[in-house]
Amino acid sequence: MSAAPELPSEESLAHQIYRGIRGKIISGALPQGSRLRERELAEEFRVSRVPLREAFPQLEADGFIQSSPRRGVRVTSLTLKDVDDLFEARLGLEVYATRLAAARAAAGASVDALDAALRAAEDAYPTKDPDLIAEANVAVHDEIVWLAGNSLLSTMMHAISGRYRWIFRMTYTPEVAGSGDEHRDIFEAIRNGDPDLAAAIALVHVVHGRKPTLAMLAGTLPRE
């Protein structure tokens, strides 16, 4: 019998469970379309069903699960359109967040946290560990959004960030993951306080990832 997942104590219990279930979905331990059985999950996380049920709405809002009276709660079955929709959303929100981040840096906001996240990502790439690289990669994007200083934008990007982590994990290869050069270029433009250049590089970064990701998933996901 496997040990219960390690959950950080400083979070609310429901959010700990949210992160735990999300991690199992992203890793594939809970496959797409599989049913979430409350009793089994409650035993695994060593909790009652109450915090488990409290975690479900956020998982559903972030696109990881779907619930219906007849089919119960199941892991979302992604389609190619879902993936393409994600990239379209990133083209709008993430590129704009990058522009705002550069503008705030130009006004004197610190880029130290983003620099640290970028260095951690650059250290992760040589390991070829898909989970470590996915976490580090998304952390860079999260720090850019945080630096943008817009709480509503940050909330909107939260769901995108989680689903991006899921898709990144599904399609990971060292070749697709790259070396993080574009992240470094984005960072330099932000640090130099150049919103136009930062947004332009961010746009190219998202576009570069779109086509190979869709191509890799074309044989495994339905179109719609």
Regions found by a protein language model. Give the residues of each.
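Short linear motifs at protein or domain termini
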Residues: 1-103, 214-224
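A short secondary-structure junction motif
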Residues: 24, 28, 151, 160-167, ...
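Hydrophobic residues in alpha-helical segments
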Residues: 25, 101, 105, 125, ...
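C-terminal regulatory/effector modules of DNA-binding transcriptional regulators
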Residues: 44, 173-224
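Conserved amphipathic alpha-helical segments that form helical-bundle/coiled-coil interaction surfaces
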Residues: 86, 90, 107-169, 180-189, ...
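Short alpha-helical functional segments enriched in proximate histidine and acidic residues
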Residues: 100, 143, 147, 212
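Short helix-capping/hinge motifs at transmembrane helix termini and TM-loop junctions
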Residues: 102-106, 149, 172-173, 218
